[in-house]
């Protein structure tokens, strides 16, 4: 048997951890306390649309109904080549977690002033996963402090780079 030829690096698409959508505003608007990886119940046309890289987590959030966690306002556009069996773009989608994880999340949400926010949507081993965060909303002054801290860190890194190059 002939051995397979090695291809160019990066020539094949890495389907193991392909990020479809990320919610960058969530890290700005919320203080992330804990993250969970959850499966998501999807229809076939939704998966095909996600493989095309089409999704928006901008207004998405998760809620608890009857001991189940649902993802609401996730926008997955209709599959372009779909027929009359296409899905509704903003339908509610069930998140798949272990019962003990669900009970743990429900307890934490009820105890504190916390919410569930999706951070990213990605493929792992051919399955769609959602990175879900247990988060607390930030006030305006908290957001300003984070921006100031990030600017200060950026300045320190810039100055260290200058000193390393001998430009002092």
Curated annotation (Swiss-Prot):
GO MF terms, alphabetically ordered: RNA binding
Principal location: cytoplasm
SUPFAM superfamilies per UniProt: Small protein B (SmpB)
PROSITE patterns: SSRP
Cellular component annotations (GO), alphabetically ordered: cytosol
Protein's GO biological process: trans-translation
UniProt cross-references to InterPro entries, sorted A to Z: SmpB (IPR023620), SsrA-bd_prot (IPR000037), SsrA-bd_prot_CS (IPR020081)
Protein's cellular compartments: Cytoplasm
Keywords for this protein: Cytoplasm, RNA-binding
Entry-linked Pfam families: SmpB
Protein family: Belongs to the SmpB family.
HAMAP family named among the record's database cross-references: SmpB
Job of this protein: Required for rescue of stalled ribosomes mediated by trans-translation. Binds to transfer-messenger RNA (tmRNA), required for stable association of tmRNA with ribosomes. tmRNA and SmpB together mimic tRNA shape, replacing the anticodon stem-loop with SmpB. tmRNA is encoded by the ssrA gene; the 2 termini fold to resemble tRNA(Ala) and it encodes a 'tag peptide', a short internal open reading frame. During trans-translation Ala-aminoacylated tmRNA acts like a tRNA, entering the A-site of stalled ribosomes, displacing the stalled mRNA.
Protein name stated in the entry: SsrA-binding protein
Organism from which the protein derives: Mycobacterium sp. (strain KMS)
Gene: smpB
